[in-house]
Regions:
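Active-site mouth loops of central-metabolism enzymes
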Residues: 1-14, 37, 63-75, 94, ...
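Short beta-strand segments at enzyme active-site cores
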Residues: 30-34, 63, 118-120, 154-155
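Histidine/acidic residue-rich metal-binding segments in metalloenzymes
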Residues: 77-215
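Metal-associated gating/positioning segment near the N- to mid-region
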Residues: 1-57
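Glycine-/small-residue-rich active-site loops that bind phosphorylated ligands and cofactors
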Residues: 11, 38-42, 71, 97-98, ...
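Short, composition-biased local secondary-structure segments
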Residues: 45-58, 71-81, 135-140
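Structured loop/turn residues at beta-strand edges in well-structured enzyme cores
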Residues: 26, 60, 85
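Alpha-helix-loop-beta-strand connector modules within alpha/beta enzyme cores
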Residues: 44-65, 108-119
Length: 215
């Protein structure tokens, strides 16, 4: 659900051929690509171009996501209103949408169009001084929006007990929320690993909560 092939614009990091071959070698038959390309994938036309090139490779099925806000500008969502039925997911990839009204309007549009919102939860005003609160507070907001609008929401790389609790409570209230966790957030703790990722490596308590949720 969460891959970065970087076509167009950043092919020196990964391109459609290398990504397709890696997916096939790992046994993956479907991959979902993030829109952090250059230009940012903010249209169905650009998404279809990437998907067509991947289809020509013929090694795996590909879906190209579209950005929540146009060019990741944080506010413009008019492009969402014209997305065709083939678009399945929107995401701001490694950014949280900071403006509450913008995100609420995006959720409302996605409910009408049956599009799933994929969310990197990070309040950028808070993250400079508290990464944990930054993830937790935006997870709570997005779960409430999912419940209110009944918008399908997928929370990316959940890493804290608080965020997980918010997701579980939202699901109990009937919100259509799913989530994922990365291997490194299940394996490492911040007292044994000085490795910089976003979201950060968390505490042993967070790791145990994530493992328990999988079980």
């Amino acid at each position: 659900l969460h891959c970065h092939w970087r076509t167009p614009g950043f092919e020196y990091k990964e391109d459609i051929e290398t990504g397709s071959r890696a997916a096939a070698a790992g046994g993956y038959t479907f991959v979902n690509l993030m829109p952090n390309t250059k230009p940012v994938c903010s249209s169905a036309a650009q998404a279809m171009m990437v998907e067509q090139k991947a289809a020509e490779m013929g090694l795996c099925d590909v879906n190209q996501t579209v950005s929540i806000t146009e060019n990741f500008d944080g506010v413009s969502i008019d492009h969402l209103k014209t997305l065709p039925a083939g678009v399945k997911f929107i995401t701001e990839d490694g950014h949280g949408v900071q403006d509450n009204a913008t995100m609420a309007k995006a959720f409302a549009i996605c409910t009408q169009k049956d599009i799933t919102v994929m969310s990197h939860a990070e309040d950028m005003e808070i993250s400079p001084w508290d990464y944990r609160l930054a993830e937790d507070i935006e997870t709570v907001r997005n779960c409430w929006l999912s419940e209110y609008y009944q918008t399908k929401l997928h929370m990316c790389h959940v890493s804290t007990r608080g965020a997980l609790d918010a997701i579980q409570m939202a699901k109990l209230r009937g919100a259509p929320v799913t989530c994922e966790v990365t291997p490194h957030h299940l394996w490492f703790t911040n007292d044994t690993c000085d490795y910089r990722v976003n979201p950060p490596i968390r505490t042993a308590d967070d790791v145990q909560a994530l493992i328990d949720a999988i079980r």
